[in-house]
Amino acid sequence: MEGKVFSGQKLILVMLLLGHLHGFSSCIEKERKALLELKKFVMSRCEECEYDSVLPTWTNDTKSDCCQWENIKCNRTSRRLTGLSLYTSYYLEISLLNLSLLHPFEEVRSLDLSNSRLNGLVDDVEGYKSLRRLRNLQILNFSSNEFNNSIFPFLNAATSLTTLSLRRNNMYGPIPLKELKNLTNLELLDLSGNRIDGSMPVREFPYLKKLKALDLSSNGIYSSMEWQGLKNLTNLEVLSLGYNYFDGPIPIEVFCEMKNLQELDLRGINFVGQLPLCFGNLNKLRFLDLSSNQLTGNIPPSFSSLESLEYLSLSDNSFEGFFSLNPLTNLTKLKVFIFSSKDDMVQVKIESTWQPLFQLSVLVLRLCSLEKIPNFLMYQKNLHVVDLSGNRISGIIPTWLLENNPELEVLQLKNNSFTIFQMPTSVHNLQVLDFSENNIGGLFPDNFGRVLPNLVHMNGSNNGFQGNFPSSMGEMYNISFLDLSYNNLSGELPQSFVSSCFSLSILQLSHNKFSGHFLPRQTNFTSLIVLRINNNLFTGKIGVGLLTLVDLCILDMSNNFLEGELPPLLLVFEYLNFLDLSGNLLSGALPSHVSLDNVLFLHNNNFTGPIPDTFLGSIQILDLRNNKLSGNIPQFVDTQDISFLLLRGNSLTGYIPSTLCEFSKMRLLDLSDNKLNGFIPSCFNNLSFGLARKEEITNYYVAVALESFYLGFYKSTFVVENFRLDYSNYFEIDVKFATKQRYDSYIGAFQFSEGTLNSMYGLDLSSNELSGVIPAELGDLFKLRALNLSHNFLSSHIPDSFSKLQDIESLDLSYNMLQGSIPHQLTNLTSLAIFNVSYNNLSGIIPQGKQFNTFDENSYLGNPLLCGPPTDTSCETKKNSEENANGGEEDDKEVAIDMLVFYWSTAGTYVTALIGILVLMCVDCSWRRAWLRLVDAFIASAKSKLA
């Protein structure tokens, strides 16, 4: 009987246990439905999203346990939701958040709505008190949204909050701490990356009595700061004020009285002076960042008391002269030390016998005038990152660092004077190695890839390596970035490398002596997005293997000996943004269709035939100079983005089409050295040449989908220090344009619109057969820096409107048929450095003053009617010559008058004699009879002769 009872009890327990376990199988139904409503909210703001692609585990399946969904955490016992994140990688429309959507999550403790494109909060029922419904909410992350100060009244109702992050929003003006006075439990407040300015009301911080961590970095200008009030934050352990600009001196002693500080971030706050002695009193300090200031002097001895210090950064300050690291000797917990100078004015002095007690994880001594590897590194065994770039270290590359530090991941030695590369004796797991810009010569090590097979980034450019490309490089299966440009390497690329490095994303081998056919067969470079092999000796046609690299974004094969036609397939790669095939032997006709978005360089080849009407497409920079192209400039269709159109040195004929005037984003237009005729279109003033509104100016961004190499080596409360490689700096555009009587290179960065290229605006129509007048409308292009109309048949006058070209630096109108005087108003062109009007028919006085006083007589040759400096022709002599010419004209007029008198006097004499004869005949009859007989005799004689 007892056995049956016992068995029954066990059965009941099993049933209860099964029922209990069944309760764990699913989340709360109300919360599951609420999560699906949140997903609908996200979907409503994403036009291109499909339902299954956004938060795909959040499904309508009733059997699906929402506690197992992504971005969700639940209590193991109650199955209530405790953690929620709405993060998605999709681009969402900006929207308000209705807080009532969150009310079903009554037990939620952590709410992450960062990166959600939210710009405000709303609740039509409970208003500002809405968040009080979430009575257990402790962590609220609203970072990287579009919120402004209007959300503070809502936040004040979340009285249980301990952590509040409003990083990277649109907060502005003074910090409205009074509106957060009910958040008495708040321990961490992050307001970094906003636009907070004005005064910092430190006196209001006592509302937040439990505050331990405060981040106000990267905001703006604090016009005033109640510095002394910081001392009242007695519980504060973490303070970040980095990258703000404070008016007036900073009383650094205030920080010295905050005895509980463990992390202090004062980067980039314009801190001037020496390192404070009193910092040595902060014996709890673990993290201290004073980089990017104007600190001088040396590390004070009091720093030796910072027994808890793990992280110290003093980089980018104004230290000069000798700099000693001796005060750091006894800091046994120091893991990260970062030091670099701004302008190589400091010399770090490290005694050969110095043996500190710490074991570093990260050491950066960049631009410190070091002449040898510090000896203390011989005793470091836990290094992960070493950066000794920009020094004067010579001799052998210190590969013993790899042998002593098996966990070393990053070794930066660029821009030194190393001469010998010696490989480690055993295989190492190093991931980043940069020894570029040294003086290393000799053969490149054959076993390089076998000893360092795990390299992700390798840069050995700008050295003197010789010999062939090592076949062992094919064993670096993880390599993503490889740069051996600017060396003397030769031969062909080994097949083992071409067929094995499928992770390679960036390959740069330019400025070497590599030869042979490039990629004649298919390769395994399936991840390649940047390929630069320019300035080598490659020959033959463009290889079949190259045409399989469909993910390429940047391809530079310029200045080789490639021949044959341009494969049309190459110009329709989906992601290709930059293609440079200039300086080769390519020939044939241009393809009719191009899908490139940005840059196409085909100059200095042998292309023939016309330019297709559809050739431009979405290209922003097109360079076809110095080919053998013929025909008219086409009526380009379906193009709006062209900014640089360079067609110099071909055999183009016909008129300049007026459709060019529709290129409203034009910056450089070079049609010189062709056979164009007709007039210069007066509509050229429609071309922007820098006149476009700011938002219309093109950003020459080449999208490279390669993630930067990232290695986090220290994480504090607010600052995550890391080693990062940014590859965008490798990509630049170089455009040559004739100005100031020479060809200059104008450089532009792809991503950031930096460099001289983005400030250059020019028009070159020289060496053609253009005729007619110079349109006055060209004077409206007041951003032009270079204008060249020389070697044409232009006539009439120099337009007075050219005086509006305020930024013009080079103006060349030589070898035309221009007449009249040089407009005096041109002396107001204060930027003008080159002015040439030689070999025209100009006359009058040469203007003087300002920039015109700098031009020599070569600017005016071949204009005999011009006078004044800098020519030898005096305007006074010219005036006398003109007066003499005027005197001759008066003599001619007098001669003309004398002849007129002669003619009139002769006629008068004849008439007078005739009248006298008639009078005598009337008075004397004998005279009349004699006259009549004479007339009759004359008539009779005439008749007889006629008979």
Swiss-Prot record:
It is a single-pass type I membrane protein. Residues 921-947 are cytoplasmic. Residues 28-899 are extracellular. GO terms for cellular component: plasma membrane. It holds the Pfam family LRR_14. Keywords: Cell membrane, Glycoprotein, Leucine-rich repeat, Membrane, Receptor, Repeat, Signal, Transmembrane, Transmembrane helix. Belongs to the RLP family. This is Receptor-like protein 56. It comes from Arabidopsis thaliana. The gene is RLP56.
